[in-house]
Amino acid sequence: MRQYLDLLAHVLENGIDREDRTGTGTRGVFGYQMRFDLSDGFPVLTTKKLHLRSIIYELLWFLKGDTNIRYLQENGVTIWDEWADENGDLGPVYGAQWRSWPAPDGRHIDQIANLLNGLRENPYSRRHIVTAWNPAEIDGMALPPCHCLFQFHVAEGRLSCQLYQRSADIFLGVPFNIASYALLTMMIAQVTGLKPGDFVHTLGDAHLYKNHFDQAREQLTRTPKPLPTMWINPEVDDLFAFGYEDFRLEGYVADPTIRAPIAV
């Protein structure tokens, strides 16, 4: 994906060096946008291989409203281990906000169910928004949401999604986020009778950690390959009924993984 390599190059060449919460140090820019036409193929990196299993199971975990890593660990996914407490809990992170946002009157709001209803009943609304940024519960979260708000848009029978990501770990996090929200868009398009449109990824603080510079430069020496396609089981018409076996990435050819340390 040339869009992603352009982002890497832009930050390396034009970013500003700053200290950060983790003490690692970053180079970054504030404000950057990428657009992916989902009819061109599934936007997963081909210049390094990604662990698609982790991406799919994490998305299913979000949609379940789960905030304990037990489900992830049972399915071989360890990407949240560093932030969980001794019981595997993360506090009211993404899944809780998506599926059970606490209202002042004691109700809990299922933002995903509301989104689906809105897309079916009033597709041209400008209110198809889900947010994970709940100021009242930030302090109880193991990690405040990085990808914090997304909006859907319907035009000419195509469903597009724009994600706002306040904090974007370009080397490790952003490739996962692109694939995850592209897949979510395709899933929601299927269950609402629409075709996938664009995924627009808007980044706030887009940064490379200093201990990822060499890995980013190595990736920039690689040439992108044709995008694969994502097969989604056409029999599934309920967003909450999808399982891991309902997805298959076809034609995925990628360069080897480039390992990099995670900043906690």
UniProtKB/Swiss-Prot annotation:
Pathway: Pyrimidine metabolism; dTTP biosynthesis. It holds the Pfam family Thymidylat_synt. One of its GO terms (biological process) is methylation. The active site is at C146 (nucleophile). DUMP binds at R21, R126, R127, R166, S167, A168, D169, N177, H207, L208, Y209. Keywords: Cytoplasm, Methyltransferase, Nucleotide biosynthesis, Transferase. GO terms for cellular component: cytosol. GO terms for molecular function: thymidylate synthase activity. It is found in: Cytoplasm. SUPFAM superfamilies: Thymidylate synthase/dCMP hydroxymethylase (SSF55831). It catalyses: dUMP + (6R)-5,10-methylene-5,6,7,8-tetrahydrofolate = 7,8-dihydrofolate + dTMP. Its EC number is 2.1.1.45. InterPro entries: Thymidate_synth/dCMP_Mease, Thymidate_synth/dCMP_Mease_dom, Thymidate_synth/dCMP_Mease_sf, Thymidylate_synthase, Thymidylate_synthase_AS. (6R)-5,10-methylene-5,6,7,8-tetrahydrofolate binds at H51, D169, A263. Its main location: cytoplasm. Catalyzes the reductive methylation of 2'-deoxyuridine-5'-monophosphate (dUMP) to 2'-deoxythymidine-5'-monophosphate (dTMP) while utilizing 5,10-methylenetetrahydrofolate (mTHF) as the methyl donor and reductant in the reaction, yielding dihydrofolate (DHF) as a by-product. This enzymatic reaction provides an intracellular de novo source of dTMP, an essential precursor for DNA biosynthesis. Homodimer. Belongs to the thymidylate synthase family. Bacterial-type ThyA subfamily. This is Thymidylate synthase. The gene is thyA.
